[in-house]
């Protein structure tokens, strides 16, 4: 090692952000191991690397004692005072023992240490960068795929998109650019492992936060997301300011905002409904685009019984129960849907017991603004 090597470490520190001092200390520690392995395993030594010219010196560290039992680790008081009269018992004396051919070992060791530390530092920098991006969106480029993962280049690292996190309505080809949600960042022996998703509800949430300024600045709050990726999703939104239309803000002028998100999700249908702290109103809104006649609420069991017009029953339940299922996920309430005629037969339209809260929705509540966006067409259900 020489001054050029030390200059190289200085450059490395500037370009890679790897501390020069940390590398030198690692080299010194590695050289101690190298010395013991090649010259004297039992000796207690210290290796000193000159920070200016890169020269290396090895010192044996010996304890000052009255009587020497192990000359490799101890030195007599008389001999120590011959070096420096100020030494006393229990002091430590350092004696240079640098081997003549130690430079070759030092050069090999230094190269290995620097390579390892650069690799570790780069992995650490990448991990620190991506751990802050958990639960966020990044755009990557599809590289390849196997029967378990699609490998997506995120610039500094390759992320893994598991089969279970891939949308069923889209296929992926080499060099495709995709937006994905970072679900997990883990340290491994091979470096950071980044797991991403195209199906996570967080992807839809972040897309709205990025696309709708009112959500980004807090004017509109996205309260909940329920998603069956690639097919249909529901989100509930709320604004403290009564003059702000949270649904309209998310839809955007002529549906432009939500349509951008629909396009990104390859045509996934999105229902945008108004959130309410009143479970009766919230559940009714969540079942959009279906109309609701009445909602009976059981607070203790967190269940609701929803009555809809006969001609709206199929719409309320949805294909394979999807609309009701998403509404339940969105609100956190169990939902049992019955047609108006069935409810009449069961006497459910009569006054309920005091333990159940009921509300027959008036026309104003039933017409609470919601939006359903399917493909390139944005419309508001009446």
Curated annotation (Swiss-Prot):
Annotated ranges, domain KH: 301-367
Q: Name one Pfam family in it.
A: KH_5
The organism's superkingdom is given as: Bacteria
Which PROSITE patterns does its entry note?
KH_TYPE_1, S1
User: One of this protein's GO BP terms?
Assistant: DNA-templated transcription termination
Mind naming one GO cellular-component term on file for this protein?
cytosol
Keywords of the record, alphabetical order, are: Cytoplasm, RNA-binding, Transcription, Transcription antitermination, Transcription regulation, Transcription termination
Q: How does it assemble?
A: Monomer. Binds directly to the core enzyme of the DNA-dependent RNA polymerase and to nascent RNA.
| Entry protein name | Transcription termination/antitermination protein NusA
Tell me which species this is from: Halalkalibacterium halodurans (strain ATCC BAA-125 / DSM 18197 / FERM 7344 / JCM 9153 / C-125)
Gene name linked to the record = nusA
